[in-house]
Amino acid sequence: MKTDFKFSNLLGTVYCQGNLLFSPDGTHLFSPVGNRVTVFNLVDNKSYTLPFSHRKNIARIGLTPQGNLLLSIDEDGQAILTNVPRRVVLYHFSFKAPVTALSFSPSGRHFIVGLGRKIEVWHVPSTPDANADGELEFAPFVKHHTHVQHFDDVRHIEWSHDSRFFLTSSKDLTARIWSVDQEEGFTPTVLSGHRQGVVGAWFSKDQETIYTVSKDGAVFDWQYVAKPGQDEDMVDDDDLAWRIVNKHYFMQNSATVRCAAFHPESNLLVAGFSNGIFGLYEMPDFNMIHTLSISQNEIDFVTINKSGEWLAFGASKLGQLLVWEWQSESYILKQQGHFDSMNSLVYSPDGQRIVTVADDGKIKVWDTESGFCIVTFTEHTSGITACEFSKKGNVLFTSSLDGSIRAWDLIRYRNFRTFTAPERLSFSCMAVDPSGEIVAAGSVDSFDIHIWSVQTGQLLDRLSGHEGPVSSLAFAPNGGLLVSGSWDRTARIWSIFNRTQTSEPLQLNSDVLDIAFRPDSLQIAISTLDGNLSFWSVSEAEQQAGLDGRRDVSGGRKIGDRRTAANVAGTKAFNTIRYSTDGSCLLAGGNSKYICLYSVTTMVLLKKYTVSVNLSIQGTQEFLNSKLLTEAGPQGLLDEQGEASDFEDRIDRSLPGSKRGDPSARRKNPEVRVNGVAFSPNGSAFCAASTEGLLIYSLDTTIQFDPFDLNMEITPTSTLAVLEKEKDYLKALVMAFRLNEAGLIQRVFQAIPYTDIPLVVEQFPNVYVARLLRYVAAQTEQSPHVEFCLLWIKALVDKHGAWLSANRGKVDVELRVVARAVSKMRDEIRKLADENVYMVDYLLGQASAAKETNTTKTLALEWATTGSDEQPGAGGMSLNDVMQQDEGNASEDEWIGLV
């Protein structure tokens, strides 16, 4: 089994804090998610997360006008410059202070950062697509200017259209006008008059007017004019100044303005308020277009795309991200992450969906291809502890602390069955047999295991034997046995389908945390509180092997820990374990920043995956800095809310002594942990439910350069020469797979004529068949050439069917991917056909009617040319009768072709 899994995507969290950005074409949205950046494709409905990560949560992001360079800055001022198309980190830089504002110039030559009350102008590194000479010129950032005239933090920066001037808005109640370079006759100007901090300032399209918005809901229009009442003929240049010509107010009662954005081309002003309402206004007349409530908490950021059609909103307290099309008044994107930490997850049998459950009582179904949440269930009234799919994947089962087990229909998206115990219990674990007819659950209140029938919903049995709370349950994949683990330091194997209930106890040295069945049902893995992993034979009920994973899983030190990271007791156990699809590896995670992958055959650690390096989360650093230790305790644990300048930021809405449940807990150093892991059914990826969100690690090599069987003669140039000049399609395809460049493979693949596909596949080497099969399956899901891809699949199955059957264990993953792609295509075609049945019937009916009309007109033309009113072949029908049969749709001149 391959172990080179790489981080590929982050789900479960769509927005944390900071600003949002639209791409220059307006089709992509960049959102800061913790210490990473997620890109949402709003046209194709897909998302991906850039592979880099910061050491702290991201505070500001900026994008060049060309859309090729992304600058992201964390809370400490550490910046990363990234090439967006290549997804490669280019440069690391430190601004040595927290950055409060960031903006790139429209020309792409400069960018400005706000460092508290200081403003710095920097040169943007040149790239081949931005430099006029087309040369690669890359150097560290070069500072152009520094301005220090504000008296409080700068909150917003806006450029003029010609990139010569820029506006800054600050908490010191003023906005200021600056020039990038020294301009003749220009001096920096202060725009003062607001009673609270200025949220933003913008130029109009003609740059004759400046609009400023303050926190108290005031909108001022500024113009470069003389004093009111002064004679225009007597006005000198010294008399002209930026003055307020109009004042407007939002009138949102006690709500304050948290964010605002302006679109100069359409004169649209949008403002987000602290009560979750946003308003859209047309300037300069301040005509309200509409207002809408989109959140229960304050809106933290709003931005407008280049065309002015879409508005993007971010609300950090609930983790909401929305894109609103104001003209049609509809949502383009509406996503929200879990309010609390995720407890469990499960892959659907086809691998296309991932279900996550959390302490907020919500169940979310995520699409693995798009990365979006497609449905959310909210019927549970307390935290959800476990989730399982039925074998076919149409039914989902969840257990909750509210004392219920619920069954969900994922076709109609409804709860069709609820299972409860005679007494009120808090269920902590659950298992479903492969047939989907039996559900078992254990609780922390009772030491019994409850068994229900899915068809009737009745409680069938209660299994007694454990002397402590049941912590884990698992059915054998073949459906014959049930294994349970408890805090009484035993695991039991139950034969629940026999006439007599028997259980085989397995004695362990510590409390059982989790149990996993191997896919062949011959072995179980048990994780205990002492950090050990034990492997037991199901048939003989004997331990086959064991692993001490305390040193592997331990790592990371919390702010208040007095012991080193290696000696912290809370991180020395695996809370969740899962077998790989082929049963050769075991994936384990716990209350630490590591996920461990073990080999079951050799009992060695194969690889450790670091969940997060975010220092905003406790438990991610190995050593603590003694300089951060004060007399009152570690600085990270001190409450600094009382020192905030804004009143609403000084309010502490959390209960005294509470450690969870506060909406702002994401900013109060939560602890890193992995509550659930799962392998995808095809074994090409695994996911982990962590504090950062739903992390997906995959073997996808579409972005990475991974050559296979390479030599000096194989280059992209030689491959294209073989393809275009020699027309040797087989050789060109093999060379492309050796280089393993996605663009080259696609070019060669699409250049092969469909008539030559059987000949190329017949001579294709067996060593590349699995790679070609996986590539064709991926093309089937993405490419519009449906028949072309199906011809490739048919040829591969026909020509290499014997080899695929003999090596089924090696290509099992590829065959599953192909089956999934073909099944998805079939469903899409069936859906398209079902939706257009009546349209096809109508078109066929129109064709038949047109054919009958043409036949009638032909007969009439023959009669007209012969001059007879009645013909033998017409069945005694006269010309007048034929004309009346046409119901007057055409005149006689049209019949005989005169018109």
Swiss-Prot record:
Region span, Disordered: 639-668, 866-899
Gene3D superfamilies in UniProt: YVTN repeat-like/Quinoprotein amine dehydrogenase
Top-rank lineage group of the source organism: Eukaryota
InterPro entries named in the record: G-protein_beta_WD-40_rep, PWP2, SSU_processome_Utp12, WD40/YVTN_repeat-like_dom_sf, WD40_repeat_CS, WD40_repeat_dom_sf, WD40_rpt
Keyword Repeat: yes
Sequence ranges of Acidic residues compositional bias: 889-899
Basic and acidic residues: bias regions: 647-668
Keywords, comma-separated and alphabetical: Repeat, WD repeat
Keyword ATP-binding appears in the UniProt entry: no
WD repeats: 9-52, 53-92, 94-132, 149-188, 193-232, 252-291, 294-334, 337-376, 379-418, 422-464, 465-504, 507-546, 569-608, 669-709
Gene Ontology cellular-component terms listed: cytoplasm; Pwp2p-containing subcomplex of 90S preribosome; small-subunit processome
Coiled-coil region(s): none
BP GO terms, sorted: endonucleolytic cleavage in 5'-ETS of tricistronic rRNA transcript (SSU-rRNA, 5.8S rRNA, LSU-rRNA); endonucleolytic cleavage in ITS1 to separate SSU-rRNA from 5.8S rRNA and LSU-rRNA from tricistronic rRNA transcript (SSU-rRNA, 5.8S rRNA, LSU-rRNA); endonucleolytic cleavage to generate mature 5'-end of SSU-rRNA from (SSU-rRNA, 5.8S rRNA, LSU-rRNA); establishment of cell polarity; maturation of SSU-rRNA from tricistronic rRNA transcript (SSU-rRNA, 5.8S rRNA, LSU-rRNA); ribosomal small subunit assembly; septum digestion after cytokinesis
UniProt xrefs under PANTHER family: PERIODIC TRYPTOPHAN PROTEIN 2 HOMOLOG, WD40 REPEAT PROTEIN
Family to which the UniProt record says this protein belongs: Belongs to the WD repeat PWP2 family.
This protein's name: Periodic tryptophan protein 2 homolog
